[in-house]
Amino acid sequence: MIKKRLFIGSSSEELKTAEIVKEVLLKDFEVTIWNDNVWDTAVFKINQNFLADLLKASLQFDFGILIGTKDDKVMFREVEMIQPRDNVLFELGLFTGRLGTSKCAFLIDKEIKLPSDFNGLTLARFDSTNEATVIAGANSIKDLFLASADDEINFFPSATLASVYYENLIVPICRFIIDNNGFTKGDTHYQKCKLNIIVPERINQDVNLQFEKLKGLFTTENVSFKYSGRPRQISVDTQIKNDTLEFIDFPTIITGINHAISNLLPNDFNKQSPDYSSILDRELRRFITTLKKLLIRGGFDEMVNVKRDSEL
């Protein structure tokens, strides 16, 4: 089973704390620590290349933990206060916006006072003089992340496309079968029906051509039917196997994943790089995961199989 990827952001002065947190999480997650060394070499603490890396990272990780420590002194209403580094707060905002509040957490020193804007975020406090409190905070965040990993649908491009595909094709087919106690094809009524959704292992540049090659592995016949409330006919390929009518669909909607990711990344990002391929692969897995969650929620999971082309 592929481990979920987790990002830890901290100041370079608190790498020891980040390493403790990483040790707690390594059993359940693939963990990467990002510290602020790169910020120290950037113009005004920020540049386009670094932002590109952060945007890329926010698409490559499933969860984020930002560690807030007593790094900077600031004056607030004529009172001296201690706050985390600006870059840590920036990363917290970026990852929370991208991943959602249930998949991003702030592990923060107990002596830091946070503004009310942080209400609603997942917070865990620790005492910088007591390692046990760091471990306890990391464990509480770990439990939250593990609990949220399989029961939420986020709105990454892949999840949005999966939701559209589910509502516009899967639901009409399944409801039509249920309402009609099967499906009539020609002179034969089939009570046993199944929908097979075939998803490729990777997304090629021309997804339509990719699916046409996959369709060559099947001997199918196209059927169409009118679904209540829809202005158009639903059209889908079918085959008969073991007295079961199998609907077969190749979701060309996944073409949108490539376009969406391209728009989310900087224009000069290398679309041929391993990092880009990694992001696409992750989104394809999210597409499948989201579909399976929606099928369970809708009660259609026993009627639908989602397969990778390698399983054919």
Swiss-Prot record:
Enzymatic class: hydrolase
Subunit structure: Forms homodimers; in the presence of c-di-GMP forms filaments with an ordered array of parallel-stacked subunits.
Regulation: NAD(+) hydrolase activity is strongly stimulated by c-di-GMP, weakly by 3'3'-cGAMP, very weakly by c-di-AMP but not at all by 2'3'-cGAMP. Self-association of TIR domains is required for NADase activity.
Function: Effector protein of a CBASS antiviral system with NAD(+) hydrolase activity. CBASS (cyclic oligonucleotide-based antiphage signaling system) provides immunity against bacteriophage. The CD-NTase protein synthesizes cyclic nucleotides in response to infection; these serve as specific second messenger signals. The signals activate a diverse range of effectors, leading to bacterial cell death and thus abortive phage infection. A type I-D CBASS(GG) system. Binds c-di-GMP, does not bind cUMP-AMP. Upon activation by c-di-GMP forms filaments which hydrolyze NAD(+); filament formation is required for enzyme activation.
Name listed for the protein in its UniProt record: CD-NTase-associated protein 12
Keyword Zinc: no
Keywords per UniProt: Antiviral defense, Hydrolase, Nucleotide-binding
InterPro entries assigned to the protein according to its UniProt record, in alphabetical order: CAP12/PCTIR_TIR_dom, Prok_STING
CDD domains: STING_bact-like
Family note: In the C-terminal section; belongs to the bacterial STING family.
Residue intervals of the TIR domain: 5-127
Pfam families referenced in this protein's UniProt entry, alphabetically: CAP12-PCTIR_TIR, prok_STING
GO molecular function: NAD+ nucleosidase activity; NADP+ nucleosidase activity; nucleotide binding
The protein's Enzyme Commission number: 3.2.2.5
GO biological process: defense response to virus
Organism: Niabella drilacis (strain DSM 25811 / CCM 8410 / CCUG 62505 / LMG 26954 / E90)
Domain remark text: The N-terminal TIR domain mediates NAD(+) hydrolase (NADase) activity. The cyclic nucleotide binds in the C-terminal bacterial STING region. Upon binding to c-di-GMP the STING region closes around the ligand, which is bound by residues from 2 adjacent subunits. STING-STING interactions are the main drivers of filamentation; rearrangements in the STING domain allow reorganization of packing of the TIR domains, forming the NADase active site; cross-filament contacts strengthen the assembly.
Catalytic activity: NAD(+) + H2O = ADP-D-ribose + nicotinamide + H(+)
